[in-house]
């Protein structure tokens, strides 16, 4: 399993400009050829760029200082110093970049090859030949290069999916994701099996949807209990919420209400997103009666009953996903 990281704070530093050169042309038959000091090279800039197939910020470590290269000093014969190499930092799609000092959103990088120059390198200094005049024929000074800049930034990754699977621990979200997509979300019979979000692609006919399995939500998650708000943010950008409920449990309605309350407490926008209720584990003895009670209690909601174990209701659920997605 890869190390999922969706937030990291780093320091970025652009390169210093190279100093201009103080030099005078000295040749065999031209002992006083005049100033010929070249310009310094520009410092490297710091650029964030979206790269395909990146899904995490785990290759960055909190507190790291990442620097672009400095420009090289100018040389004689009016030769300019080499420019410093830019520092290109690759990020996944849907990465927000904040000024860590004041919390300002600097940029939102959403699509492949989007890029943002966050710091420009310092300009190279002018060599002494630039300062020659009719009065000052032999300037013995040059311009220093400009210093680069530094900035503390925070990177925040948002997973974007068409449908987010939301439920209490052990509701069956991971098993459902694995069944309808090619994802390999971890499955086991204990709470919080899913500790990081997993994405899968659901294909039907010539269309596809991105499905996200979000770690289980428990009562108080919106205040940081359990895995807390760490992953609730990832469903804030999904189009549709699929509330997965273990219909075999006696407290299935309480589970449903806990989910709604946590969504509402965390964000009204989440609460009012389009939803579909998935009553899972219909193969168990108590489920049929509970499912009828659920239909009666929540008759106005869109409800689909499924059994992943017996593969019942899966095709109907897939069709409903695509019907709902087309309403956007």
Swiss-Prot record:
Binding site for GTP: 167-174, 192-196, 213-216, 280-283, 307-309
Obligatory cofactor(s): Mg(2+)
GO biological process terms, semicolon-separated: ribosome biogenesis
Localization terms from the record: Cytoplasm
Keyword Transferase carried by entry: no
Major location (coarse): cytoplasm
Binding site for Mg(2+): 174, 194
Enzyme Commission code(s) on record: 3.6.5.-
Keyword terms: Cytoplasm, GTP-binding, Hydrolase, Magnesium, Metal-binding, Nucleotide-binding
Obg domain residues: 2-160
Enzyme class: hydrolase
InterPro entries: G_OBG (IPR031167), GTP-bd (IPR006073), GTP-bd_Obg/CgtA (IPR014100), GTP1-OBG_CS (IPR006074), GTP1_OBG_dom (IPR006169), GTP1_OBG_dom_sf (IPR036726), OBG_GTPase (IPR045086), P-loop_NTPase (IPR027417)
Alphabetized SUPFAM superfamilies for the sequence: Obg GTP-binding protein N-terminal domain (SSF82051), P-loop containing nucleoside triphosphate hydrolases (SSF52540)
GO molecular function: GTP binding; GTPase activity; magnesium ion binding
Keyword DNA repair carried by entry: no
Ranges of residues in domain OBG-type G: 161-326
Gene Ontology cellular component list: cytoplasm
Family to which this protein belongs: Belongs to the TRAFAC class OBG-HflX-like GTPase superfamily. OBG GTPase family.
Function of the protein: An essential GTPase which binds GTP, GDP and possibly (p)ppGpp with moderate affinity, with high nucleotide exchange rates and a fairly low GTP hydrolysis rate. Plays a role in control of the cell cycle, stress response, ribosome biogenesis and in those bacteria that undergo differentiation, in morphogenesis control.
PANTHER family referenced in this protein's UniProt entry, alphabetically: DEVELOPMENTALLY REGULATED GTP-BINDING PROTEIN-RELATED, MITOCHONDRIAL RIBOSOME-ASSOCIATED GTPASE 2
Subunit comment: Monomer.
NCBIfam families registered for this protein in UniProt: Obg_CgtA (TIGR02729), PRK12299.1 (NF008956), small_GTP (TIGR00231)
Full protein name: GTPase Obg
Source organism: Borreliella afzelii (strain PKo)
